[in-house]
UniProtKB/Swiss-Prot annotation:
<comment type="similarity">
    <text>Belongs to the PsbB/PsbC family. PsbC subfamily.</text>
</comment>
<keyword id="KW-0007">Acetylation</keyword>
<dbReference type="InterPro" id="IPR036001">
    <property type="entry name" value="PS_II_antenna-like_sf"/>
</dbReference>
<keyword id="KW-0464">Manganese</keyword>
<dbReference type="Pfam" id="PF00421">
    <property type="entry name" value="PSII"/>
</dbReference>
<feature type="transmembrane region" description="Helical">
    <location>
        <begin position="291"/>
        <end position="312"/>
    </location>
</feature>
<feature type="transmembrane region" description="Helical">
    <location>
        <begin position="69"/>
        <end position="93"/>
    </location>
</feature>
<keyword id="KW-0604">Photosystem II</keyword>
<dbReference type="InterPro" id="IPR005869">
    <property type="entry name" value="PSII_PsbC"/>
</dbReference>
<dbReference type="GO" id="GO:0045156">
    <property type="term" value="F:electron transporter, transferring electrons within the cyclic electron transport pathway of photosynthesis activity"/>
</dbReference>
<feature type="transmembrane region" description="Helical">
    <location>
        <begin position="447"/>
        <end position="471"/>
    </location>
</feature>
<comment type="subunit">
    <text>PSII is composed of 1 copy each of membrane proteins PsbA, PsbB, PsbC, PsbD, PsbE, PsbF, PsbH, PsbI, PsbJ, PsbK, PsbL, PsbM, PsbT, PsbX, PsbY, PsbZ, Psb30/Ycf12, at least 3 peripheral proteins of the oxygen-evolving complex and a large number of cofactors. It forms dimeric complexes.</text>
</comment>
<feature type="propeptide">
    <location>
        <begin position="1"/>
        <end position="14"/>
    </location>
</feature>
<dbReference type="GO" id="GO:0016168">
    <property type="term" value="F:chlorophyll binding"/>
</dbReference>
<feature type="modified residue" description="Phosphothreonine">
    <location>
        <position position="15"/>
    </location>
</feature>
<keyword id="KW-0812">Transmembrane</keyword>
<keyword id="KW-0157">Chromophore</keyword>
Length: 473
């Protein structure tokens, strides 16, 4: 469909290239973008852009289903999940599927069902994506005005924003319903070493929930990443889901105020940049969450956190040397500080040695040994249970270090053990991807602002190597 207005008016960004190549009628002449600019050619073709997005969703869901089944096929129930390089099954186990006391996997069938459901969904999405990319209407405005839009239409854009917020709110409530009514979720803090339980006593106090947002992000405080009980996590999802749904209704029913109309750039590329910025923030927060938090990401499935492995090693050697007759309360280490125990700056009794920097750690296997002033010496002498020794020895030897140099005193393996913790994978990948998304946010924000100001002419492509090559067609 040849558009009626001058594209240059809407695309001050010129992309110079071999303009003769036409791909399915969406060539450079009609769109202002060459074939390699991908979906930019579809900016004003709402029907085709829908196809691209649905097909992309299909690819995502296909990966989830296929990877899920791959992990099920390779899963060995006798080994912990974190020893098997799994990144999807730990998420399903955390939601309470297939696991029992202590995080032991008792049934892999729910995991199989999850994989199959995702595969079937991906087929539906894939069909829809191909249909809308190849067969469906190029634009939706004429035939399906509810689904059509113009990027400059501020009211329509905030309506779409509202619909998205409502869907996110429903997603948050799905976790709430799973925890409250549909079998519960895995609680690493359940007495006796973790179990699946229904959450009955939600934390809905705004001072507690929003108190997390007001905390310092630094050690001992840890902002929202410091959440360490499921009541707060599920209660937070009630608040978040409610805010998203109410905000969604608000954005559907209202038009942007004058200050908002002035403050934002209202173009497709601007919305892309806002979305990328939000995803970058999500990525950075997820990175910190999976690295430091052992409640939302239980160590039974993801392996210990770095601080947890370090403290576990200190605990393991305290147990060993105490059995050999050491007086762990008074033994002096090579620095003159306590070898096994010392005091934190605020007076608590903490583990000595290099792990002192991780004295904030809270973990289910360690908390029973604490008293009102930190670690309780009499409990360390009389109350250590075999399950605590086993778990700390296991965590000590499965630190999520990769090849870090600063390891909190953990004895590292150089060439014997082939082990990378899922925490390392998930934290690193989310940091790196979050950073890429942040760069994309800056790039597209700059282009969108320049285009809105009317002075962006694109990159000078006179020396583009591709210009000297034979045209593809």
């Amino acid at each position: 469909m040849k558009t009626l207005y001058s594209l240059r008016r809407f695309y001050p960004v010129e992309t110079l290239f071999n303009g003769t190549l036409a791909l399915a009628g969406r060539d450079q002449e009609t769109t202002g973008f060459a074939w390699w600019a991908g979906n930019a050619r579809l900016i004003n073709l709402s029907g085709k852009l829908l196809g691209a997005h649905v097909a992309h969703a299909g690819l995502i869901v296909f990966w989830a289903g296929a990877m899920n089944l791959f992990e099920v096929a390779h899963f060995v129930p006798e080994k912990p999940m974190y020893e098997q390089g799994l990144i999807l099954l730990p998420h399903l186990a955390t939601l309470g599927w297939g696991v029992g006391p202590g995080g032991e996997v008792i049934d892999t069938f729910p995991y199989f069902v999850s994989g199959v459901l995702h595969l079937i969904s991906s087929a539906v999405l894939g069909f829809g994506g191909i249909y809308h990319a190849l067969l469906g209407p190029e634009t939706l405005e004429e035939s399906f005005p509810f689904f059509g839009y113009v990027w400059k239409d501020r009211n329509k854009m905030t309506t779409i924003l509202g619909i998205h917020l409502i869907l996110l709110g429903i997603g948050a409530f799905l976790l709430v319903f799973k925890a409250l009514y549909f079998g519960g979720v895995y609680d690493t803090w359940a007495p006796g070493g973790g179990d699946v339980r229904k959450i009955t006593n939600l934390t809905l106090s705004p001072s507690v929930i929003f108190g997390y947002l007001l905390k310092s992000p630094f050690g001992g405080e840890g902002w929202i990443v410091s959440v360490d009980d499921l009541e707060d996590i599920i209660g937070g999802h009630v608040w978040l889901g409610s805010i998203c749904i109410l905000g969604g209704i608000w954005h559907i029913l209202t038009k942007p105020f004058a200050w908002a109309r002035r403050a934002f750039v209202w173009s497709g590329e601007a919305y892309l940049s806002y979305s990328l910025g939000a995803l970058a923030v999500f990525g950075f927060i997820a990175c910190c969450f999976v690295w430091f938090n052992n409640t939302a990401y239980p160590s039974e499935f993801y392996g210990p956190t770095g601080p947890e492995a370090s403290q576990a090693q200190a605990f393991t050697f305290l147990v060993r040397d105490q059995r050999l007759g050491a007086n762990v309360g008074s033994a002096q280490g090579p620095t003159g500080l306590g070898k096994y125990l010392m005091r934190s700056p605020t007076g608590e009794v903490i583990f000595g040695g290099e792990t002192m920097r991780f004295w904030d750690l809270r973990a289910p296997w360690l908390e029973p040994l604490r008293g009102p002033n930190g670690l309780d010496l009499s409990r360390l002498k009389k109350d250590i249970q075999p399950w605590q020794e086993r778990r700390s020895a296991e965590y000590m030897t499965h630190a999520p270090l990769g090849s870090l140099n600063s390891v909190g005193g953990v004895a590292t393996e150089i060439n014997a053990v082939n082990y990378v913790s899922p925490r390392s994978w998930l934290a690193t990948s989310h940091f790196v991807l979050g950073f890429f998304f942040f760069v994309g946010h800056l790039w597209h924000a700059g282009r969108a602002r320049a285009a809105a100001a009317g002075f962006e002419k694109g990159i000078d492509r006179d020396l583009e190597p591709v210009l000297s090559m034979t045209p593809l067609n």
